[in-house]
């Protein structure tokens, strides 16, 4: 694998196991388990299913979120790392603080106007070209995000949901 100047991570399903925390508010608000999907901007998904995003965030419990085994050691071993996530900024920031993680930059859904995450603003803030960046994620949305800016992508296969899909390309 080539050397990179920075590694940018998605957060949910990539560095942290947040599936339970993401699902609980939707279930509490009356949504069926089978209708809940991952990888979307939270504002868009809530609007699409008729749930108030503020109510969802109020019910979201950051204390049930845990890093995947080895995630802390992985980021501790990096000189530069950042986060680019569709997560709501309130819960995303709270999780980073609780875990004691301090990425160089952390952009959440509010940075993208509630739309799908974009790597270009992260790269602008860190001053690194796409060709010198690795984006690590767990969904096809993440892979497309990397493709749009032309940076390398790797799948976070330590997430069992991702590993089960046998994703193409670079798998960590």
Kindly give the residue locations of the regions a language model identified:
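Short alpha-helical scaffold segments that flank and stabilize functional sites
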Residues: 10, 28, 49, 74, ...
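N-terminal helical cap/lid subdomain that shapes the substrate entry/recognition surface
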Residues: 2-73, 80, 88-90
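A sequence-level detector of short, solvent-exposed, charge-rich linear segments
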Residues: 26-27, 34, 44-45, 75, ...
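Asp-based, Mg2+/Mn2+-dependent phosphohydrolase catalytic module
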Residues: 1-5, 82, 90-172
């Amino acid at each position: 694998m080539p050397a990179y100047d920075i590694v940018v991570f998605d957060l949910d399903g990539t560095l942290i196991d947040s599936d339970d925390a993401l699902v609980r508010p939707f279930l509490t608000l009356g949504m069926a388990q089978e209708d809940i999907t991952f990888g979307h901007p939270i504002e868009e998904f809530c609007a699409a299913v008729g749930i108030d995003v503020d109510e969802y965030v109020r019910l979201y419990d950051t204390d049930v979120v845990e890093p995947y085994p080895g995630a802390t050691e992985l980021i501790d071993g990096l000189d530069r790392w950042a986060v680019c996530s569709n997560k709501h900024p309130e819960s995303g920031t709270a999780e980073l603080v609780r875990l004691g993680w301090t990425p160089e930059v952390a952009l959440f859904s509010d940075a993208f106007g509630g739309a799908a995450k974009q790597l270009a603003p992260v790269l602008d803030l860190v001053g690194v070209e796409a060709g010198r960046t690795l984006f690590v994620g767990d969904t096809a949305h993440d892979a497309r995000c990397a493709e749009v800016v032309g940076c390398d992508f790797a799948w976070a296969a330590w997430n069992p949901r991702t590993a089960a899909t046998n994703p193409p390309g670079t798998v960590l």
